[in-house]
């Protein structure tokens, strides 16, 4: 897709519905999957927030933070993938509140029994269900979307089965075809629909930065 066409395409992707919940992102949280869909890290890189509709949501993420080691050394701590489900029906803002993670002991405790909170815009706790996402694949590169689908079908603590059935074959993404869409090959269709989805969720500043980046890319 040429850059100019990509920019026009993304501009037309601006949401026509009004989102009611702002999820504030944290630089210590690596978001992997949202509501059964793999997160587009390139589009959301540097984003401060994403917009969500009211209702149930599920995040798969890792906590990443530099911790201290003996001898004044440091290392990057990366938690196991976590699943958290919550409902934003009456909530306008969601914020992460992470526990203290400064050293190996605290990191080990978090690995064994992770705990964190989601707070609303008034700093009040939001009811959540939190669990560790057990990885079943032995592949070097983990497909977190597939792992999340398996988790949601297994009736675990933070499972939301509706996201497993909706996202199993990208049927939701592919069904949202307007008169502006052509009928490209399947792989291109998936790429464009996923890009459209994440562009809709990104905050205005992130959209602007992404469009600026797209304008600078050479034609394919």
From Swiss-Prot:
Keywords: Signal. The keyword Cell cycle does not apply. Residues 1-20 form the signal peptide. Pfam families: DUF2057. Belongs to the UPF0319 family. PANTHER family: UPF0319 PROTEIN YCCT. This is UPF0319 protein YccT. The gene is yccT.
């Amino acid at each position: 897709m040429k850059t100019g066409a990509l920019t026009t395409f993304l501009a037309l992707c601006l949401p026509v519905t009004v989102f009611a919940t702002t999820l504030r992102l944290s630089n210590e949280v690596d978001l992997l999957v949202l509501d059964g869909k793999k997160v587009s890290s390139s589009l959301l890189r540097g984003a401060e927030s994403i917009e969500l509709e009211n209702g149930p949501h599920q995040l798969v993420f890792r906590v990443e933070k530099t911790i201290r080691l003996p001898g004044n050394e440091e290392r990057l701590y990366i938690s196991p993938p976590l699943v958290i489900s919550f409902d934003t029906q009456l909530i306008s803002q969601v914020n992460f509140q992470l526990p203290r993670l400064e050293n190996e002991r605290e990191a080990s405790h978090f690995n064994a029994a992770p705990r964190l909170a989601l707070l609303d815009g008034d700093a009040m706790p939001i009811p959540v269900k939190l669990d560790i996402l057990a990885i079943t694949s032995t592949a070097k590169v983990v497909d977190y979307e597939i792992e999340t689908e398996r988790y949601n079908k297994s009736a675990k603590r933070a499972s939301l089965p509706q996201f497993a059935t909706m996202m199993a074959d990208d049927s939701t993404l592919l069904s949202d075809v307007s008169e502006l869409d052509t009928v490209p090959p399947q792989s291109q269709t998936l790429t464009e629909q996923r890009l459209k989805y994440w562009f809709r969720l990104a905050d205005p500043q992130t959209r602007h930065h992404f469009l600026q980046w797209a304008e600078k890319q050479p034609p394919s």
